[in-house]
Amino acid sequence: EFQQFVQEVDRPVYMALAPSKTVIAERDQLIPSYVASNARTRYAGMIRDFKAAGMTNLSLDQLKLTDYFKTDHHWNIDGAASAYQTITKGMDLRPVMPSKSNRKEGEHAYYGSLARKTTLAYATSGDQLAYYEPAFFKGINVCYDGACDRPVIDESFVQQEGDYVDRYEVFLRGNHGIMSMKEQTKNDRPTILVLKDSFANPVLPFLAKSANLEVVDVRYVPKSFDVSQFAKQKQVDSVLFLHNSNIAGLMKTYENTL
C-alpha cells in the first residue's frame, strides 16, 4: 500500500518516526537484561519497510529520554524542536527558531496520559510543560472543522487548575482530522502534506513557519477518505509522515485511506 501511495502521489515522501521511550531506553541500555524487549528491532524493521516503499527517512535517533515527558509517552517541546530541525534540514526548508525569551512554562504540573490512566497513583511528581508564546506564531492561519483563525497555542490549557487537565492540548487544541496551517503573507513557500498522530502537534507550529501545511490525522477522517486524491487536490510539493514509532496499530487505517 505504501509503495503504491508513493508512486501515485508522485512527490517526495519523507518519514520522521519518533522513537518510543522504550526504544531509547533500550538503546541507552537502561532496560535490565532480564526484561524481554525487542522495541529497537521492531523500530529498525519499520524504517526498513518504509524505505523499501520509496520513502526518505529523516532519522530522529539523536533524541534522548530528557526530550520526553516522564509521565507521558509524548516528547516535550525540546524533543519537538529537535525533530523540527531534523525535518527542515532533511526536506531542505529554512528553519525559523524561536529565542529563549519566547519560551514559557506552565505554572501547573502536567500529568501526562500515562499518569492519568493510573489515576496518578504511580506519579511521584508531574512534568513541567514548556511551550513557545503565541506571539512567535502570529500570522499563521489555522483552519479545521469549517473555521479559520484558530489558535496555534491555546494557553487556557496550561492556565486551568487540576491534575487531570490534558495540558498537551495547548498545541493546536489537540487532534483534528483535516487541518491547514498557512502563514498569510508567504505565498511562495512549498506546501507539505503532513500525515500525523498526536506526536506532531507541538512540531506543526514550528513547521508552519517554514512551509504551508495540509495536515491529515487518519484516525479522525471518514473511512472513504482518499489521501492520494487529497494530496493531488491540494497540489502538495511533498509528503511527511510524522508519527511515533508505535505506528503498527494504524497500519490497517492507512491501508484503507492511502
Q: Residue ranges of each PLM-predicted region?
A:
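Extracellular glycan-modifying ectodomains
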Residues: 1-258
